[in-house]
UniProtKB/Swiss-Prot annotation:
The lineage of its organism: Bacteria, Bacillati, Bacillota, Bacilli, Bacillales. CDD domains: GATase1_CPSase. The active site is at 248 (nucleophile), 333, 335. Composed of two chains; the small (or glutamine) chain promotes the hydrolysis of glutamine to ammonia, which is used by the large (or ammonia) chain to synthesize carbamoyl phosphate. Tetramer of heterodimers (alpha,beta)4. It is an enzyme of class 6 (ligase). It comes from the Bacteria. InterPro entries: Anth_synth/Amidotransfase, CarbamoylP_synth_ssu, CarbamoylP_synth_ssu_N, CarbP_synth_ssu_N_sf, Class_I_gatase-like, CPSase_GATase1, GATASE. Belongs to the CarA family. Its EC number is 6.3.5.5. It comes from Staphylococcus epidermidis (strain ATCC 12228 / FDA PCI 1200). One of its GO terms (biological process) is 'de novo' pyrimidine nucleobase biosynthetic process. This is Carbamoyl phosphate synthase small chain. Small subunit of the glutamine-dependent carbamoyl phosphate synthetase (CPSase). CPSase catalyzes the formation of carbamoyl phosphate from the ammonia moiety of glutamine, carbonate, and phosphate donated by ATP, constituting the first step of 2 biosynthetic pathways, one leading to arginine and/or urea and the other to pyrimidine nucleotides. The small subunit (glutamine amidotransferase) binds and cleaves glutamine to supply the large subunit with the substrate ammonia. Residues 1-171 are annotated as: CPSase. The gene is carA.
Length: 366
């Protein structure tokens, strides 16, 4: 017999469903993701650290979970909400069910709830604190706890690598600042022959330049960019000295380092179907996104940055480029996983930028 579980929101509403995953109940910021596939990559994305994900697609877990498709070593999210969780996956690669995987990583979840209603609530009122209980009598107590709960801060410290390591390639050398990177960023660089050195988020500009890389990338990651101000001096210290490419949180930190400001979005962009327009070409890409903060377009007016991409759904900033220096960034995920590969070409642009910069340096020193 399925055991009851309750998803409780800070506004006092609650949803009755069935126990999924761990009995280690937790609270977090509840968000929604609109991707139809890729639930495993989503669950293992470090950018969701401390959050509770509501999947809008009604059936999750139907092809199971396998270790090879994880985007990080250990999922760090605080909960999963689904309409229906598959108990009999059908895929020759699957190793565990969704329930077994969540239990293994001490992640609570709930199934059998109206995910459309939850999504509409988040859409209309913004992200909310939420938590789980297995006892209906504890709901009001949990509501009061949620109203005053301090959600985790500085999540980047939790998910960043503690020591540098190398993913070997044969050509250009790239230093990747790990703010909570997805593994597919490393894969995409390796596929293009890059030797990737992954370093902690608080590595200094001097340390990076001492490695003599051909380029620097700033990864995605969780939380508020204003809480990662340790990276701003590092960015300013390397700009112009080596080519630069920022993704998601890395994009936001790039903007902040040049004097722009960020703001918390009502419910963010999370899914694999977000249209983005390249203002340089007029081309529209369907992109994978996962962010709850955005750069204030007006704050860019007195900076050396220009907007290169915008979101078609709400007009927010999705891409930036420095007007003088070899540096650019995007708010979305060109590495996908999950999502379409429309924007893979941005890795090729970064490779071309590094080669061009290297050739100019060679000519200057000749």
């Amino acid at each position: 017999m399925l055991e009851k579980r309750y998803l409780v929101l800070e506004d006092g509403s609650y949803y009755e469903g069935y126990r999924l995953g761990s009995d280690d109940l937790s609270i977090g910021e509840i968000v929604f993701n609109t991707a139809m596939t890729g639930y495993q990559e989503t669950i293992s994305d470090p950018s969701y650290t401390g959050q509770i994900i509501t999947f809008t697609y009604p059936l999750i877990g139907n092809y199971g979970i396998n270790r090879d498709d994880f985007e990080s070593l250990t999922p760090k999210l605080n909960g999963v909400v689904v309409k229906e969780a598959s108990t009999h996956p059908s895929n020759f690669r699957h190793q565990k069910t969704l329930h077994e995987t969540l239990a293994q990583y001490h992640i609570p979840g709930i199934s059998g709830v109206d995910t459309r209603s939850i999504t509409r609530k988040i859409r209309n009122y913004g992200v909310l604190r939420a938590g789980f209980t297995d006892n209906k009598d504890n709901i009001q107590e949990l509501v009061e706890q949620l109203k005053t709960a301090e959600l985790p801060r500085d999540e980047v410290q939790t998910v960043s690598t503690k020591t540098p390591y190398v993913s070997t390639g044969s050509d250009l050398s790239v230093v990747l600042l790990d703010f909570g990177k997805k593994q597919n960023i490393v894969r995409e660089l390796n596929l293009r022959g890059c030797n990737v050195t992954v370093v902690p988020y608080d590595t200094s500009a001097e340390e990076i330049l001492g490695m003599s890389p051909d380029g620097v990338m700033l990864s995605n990651g969780p939380g508020d960019p204003d809480e990662v101000d340790v990276a701003l001096d590092m960015i300013r210290g390397i700009l112009g000295k080596i080519p630069f490419f920022g993704i998601c949180l890395g994009h936001q930190l790039f903007a902040l380092s040049q004097g722009a400001t960020s703001f918390k979005m009502k419910f963010g962009h999370r899914g694999a179907n977000h249209p983005v327009k390249d203002l340089r070409t007029g081309k529209i890409d369907i992109t994978s996104q996962n962010h709850g903060y955005s750069i204030d377009c007006d704050s860019l007016k007195n900076t050396d940055l220009e907007v290169t991409h915008i979101a078609l759904n709400d007009g927010t900033v999705e891409g930036l480029r420095h007007k003088e220096l070899p540096a650019f960034s995007v708010q979305y995920h060109p590495e996908a996983r999950p999502g379409p590969s429309d924007s893979n070409y941005l890795f090729d642009e970064f490779i071309a930028m590094m080669k061009d910069f290297k050739e100019k340096e060679r000519q200057i020193n000749a």
